[in-house]
Amino acid sequence: MLIKVFFNFLSKFHYDSIFEYSKKIDFEIMIDVGSHQGEFISRFLKHKKIKKFFCFEPNKKLFKKLVNRYKSNKRISLFDYALGEKSSKKKLYISNLTYNSTMSSFNKKSNYLKFKNIILKDKNQSTININQKSFDEVLKKKDIKNSFLKIDVEGYELNVLQGAKKNIKYAKYILIEHQFSNQYQNSFSKIKKLLKDNNFVKIKSFYFPSFHYRDILFFNNRYNKSNY
């Protein structure tokens, strides 16, 4: 499909720009929530400074591809479940454009959602049952200080953060997607408040070339204090 090829091209440009910026900042751990096909993993593996990757992808087909690609890499730990507020069973809505698969509720009144369904032929064709755990539960015994947390879960970002209340303070950077459309029933203002309450400040925005969303990089101000 031509549209898919076009958006894959734009995505490559977008991911490359984030990777280039990441060369300027210091971190040792990469936490990739919504690993998809490894777009971030493949780039960030080039950073020798990163000691460990924790990667989460609940889509079973995509997870198998990640395992086949990275199973021999000792720097990478792969997890085949979603992250959210707490441990539970969830449904993942599978889109024919796999990067748009989501656990979030849709706003059926959204004009952008209607546009995607018609023009881009982006439809959630099926659902699968998946396991969900919380960030705090999975990573509580891991050393995640000085980490870069990337969250790209198509409208489910707030849920991920709500499950990280105890350990979010250890993340040095958080990269999170901000959709400009109202296709999901969520509010980015709640995400900003949660991050602000945890001493995170915005330092950089990366706009997708089509300008329908941006990735925002937040910095944990605790790391400005000595001996943290």
Predicted regions located by residue number:
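Phosphate/nucleotide-binding beta-alpha loop and adjacent structural elements of enzyme active sites
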Residues: 1-228
